[in-house]
Design a protein with these regions (language model features):
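N-terminal accessory/capping or targeting/presequence segment of soluble
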Residues: 1-99, 108, 112, 116-170
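Nucleotide donor/acceptor-binding cores
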Residues: 102-104
């Protein structure tokens, strides 16, 4: 847990340099995958959460974590104690953002759906807050021992294994 607390401290310091109050990160990557490769497990690096569905909103003063009922027990076990954990079935994420008054939230918008970013941005505007697009993912910049991306050759499945030839799917 000491490593995770150190990762959080590094992020807090970077947030100050970016003049942002919060950083918003999820389990998904820039391809919006739910199950991401090790080198894109940004949420796990920051919070120690290893589930496939979660959002963290972190600042130097307050840390919030959102997940669904499948992962509540896991989140309580894996996250540092300074996180307040919410059940997404009971807490509306968009409304939560509306409660952030006069704040700025840094986010890599490539790692979220366009609709979610629009909804969060509207919600923040209602409370005189703003969303800041992180052009270069902040965690990628500070994650010094990030696993190497595995580049593998693609292969074509035989028709009997997938039902249709790949040419028919193009």
């Amino acid at each position: 847990m000491q490593l995770i607390n150190n990762n959080l401290k590094i992020l807090y310091s970077s947030l100050k340099k970016k003049k942002a109050d919060y950083y918003f990160v999820s389990t998904s990557d820039e391809f919006l995958n739910e199950y991401v490769p090790d080198y894109n497990m940004r949420l796990k690096w920051l919070t120690n959460f290893s589930g496939s569905n979660g959002y963290a909103l972190v600042s130097e003063k307050k840390n919030f974590f959102f997940t669904d009922g499948r992962y509540l027990q896991q989140a309580n076990k894996e996250l540092p104690k300074n996180f307040k954990i919410f059940d997404l079935n009971k807490e509306n994420l968009i409304k939560f953002f509306a409660g952030l008054k006069n704040k700025s939230v840094l986010v890599d918008t490539k790692c979220f759906s366009k609709n979610l970013i629009i909804e969060i941005s509207k919600s923040l505007q209602q409370s005189n807050s703003k969303l800041i697009h992180d052009r270069k993912n902040l965690i990628d910049c500070i994650w010094l021992e990030r696993p190497i991306e595995q580049i593998k050759k693609f292969f074509i499945l035989k028709k009997k294994e997938c039902g249709e030839a790949f040419e028919e799917k193009l």
